[in-house]
From Swiss-Prot:
This is NAD(P)H-quinone oxidoreductase subunit 4L, chloroplastic. Disulfide bonds: none annotated. The lineage of its organism: Eukaryota, Viridiplantae, Streptophyta, Embryophyta, Tracheophyta. It is found in: Plastid, Chloroplast thylakoid membrane. Keywords: Chloroplast, Membrane, NAD, NADP, Plastid, Plastoquinone, Quinone, Thylakoid, Translocase, Transmembrane, Transmembrane helix, Transport. It comes from Chloranthus spicatus (Chulantree).
Amino acid sequence: MMLEHVLVLSAYLFSIGIYGLITSRNMVRALMCLELILNAVNMNLVTFSDLFDSRQLKGDIFSIFVIAIAAAEAAIGPAIVSSIHRNRKSTRINQSNLLNK
């Protein structure tokens, strides 16, 4: 793929993720939008790593670290949402003020 196509796709994924993160009221949807943002960042890291110096794999290695963080978030996030749903009977972000009680 050409550089412009990858960057446009990455910007599109990032903007969808930001829009969904800002407007979502459901915690599960917010987690999915956060995953979109992280995937867009990974696409940029790999693309620019290949563009500037294809012999060094700094962007690729950093992308693997971001994937590991996203995997941890994908494993722990739904467990936290499940626990909040069990205690509060809701997964809406604006109804879960956990610092009050």
